[in-house]
């Protein structure tokens, strides 16, 4: 199952063409465990959408580098990363409430305190809530490839989106993407390479080996067994 990050089309100035759509946190079929997690752990780890920029030091109760993950699915790999790096703060965004509930349940079970989650459109969160020059890392793992040619424009990785991410990264911050769809990997590489301000961290100027920091997902393990490839891209903000 792909992480379905709602991605708008853009006008000629790079502004998102909004579709009228509201996200209800309880949407989707919830298991009892997910419903329990949303009711009990959302007040602790959940972040409501706001038109105002967030203050990360206040949100997390401390100053620490912030990693933003867009489209965390059921949250298993995100929680693993959060637990492995207690010295960092993590904000995860996912539009499907069952995934948010599952992530909250896992985070509670693991006892992590350095994670906050949102159930909203990631592009709108970036525009309205994330301050410029504030993120150490942005992660986008296995977004929907929209593999049919007529749907390619729906892919979240487009020049305006990548430029938006660039503006939110600190100097030296990294945008890390991964996909199991080779054509999308090539598209990501083309988009990212066209933007002044990013440096490809690949020695061969294309893809990087999977870093130890990114856990292998069950979905990815299944792909490996079937002989599917996975492509990681890491681009640093250098100006």
Swiss-Prot record:
Keywords: Methyltransferase, S-adenosyl-L-methionine, Transferase, tRNA processing. Residues 150-155 are annotated as: Interaction with RNA. Monomer. This is tRNA (guanine-N(7)-)-methyltransferase. It is an enzyme of class 2 (transferase). It comes from Salmonella paratyphi A (strain ATCC 9150 / SARB42). The active site is at residue 144. One of its GO terms (cellular component) is tRNA methyltransferase complex.
């Amino acid at each position: 199952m792909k992480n379905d990050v709602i991605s708008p089309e853009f006008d000629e100035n790079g502004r998102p063409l909004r579709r009228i759509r509201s996200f209800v946190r309880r949407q989707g079929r919830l298991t009892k465990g997910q419903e329990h997690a949303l009711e009990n752990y959302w007040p602790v780890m959940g972040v409501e959408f706001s038109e105002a920029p967030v203050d990360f030091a206040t949100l997390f109760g401390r100053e620490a580098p912030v990693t933003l993950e867009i489209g965390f699915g059921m949250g298993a790999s995100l929680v693993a990363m959060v637990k492995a790096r207690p010295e960092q703060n993590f904000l995860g965004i996912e539009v499907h409430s069952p995934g948010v509930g599952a992530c909250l349940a896992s985070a509670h079970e693991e006892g992590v305190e350095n994670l906050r989650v949102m159930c909203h459109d990631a592009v709108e969160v970036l525009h309205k809530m994330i301050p410029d020059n504030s993120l150490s890392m942005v992660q986008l793992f296995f977004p929907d490839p929209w593999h049919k040619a007529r749907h390619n424009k729906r892919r979240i990785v487009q020049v305006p989106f990548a430029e938006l991410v660039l503006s939110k990264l600190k100097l030296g911050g990294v945008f890390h993407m991964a996909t199991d769809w080779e054509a999308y990997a090539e598209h990501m590489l083309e988009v990212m390479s066209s933007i002044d301000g990013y440096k490809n961290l690949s020695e061969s100027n294309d893809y990087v080996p999977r870093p130890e920091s990114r856990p292998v997902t069950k979905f990815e393990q299944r792909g490996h067994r079937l002989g599917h490839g996975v492509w990681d891209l890491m681009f640093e903000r250098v100006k």
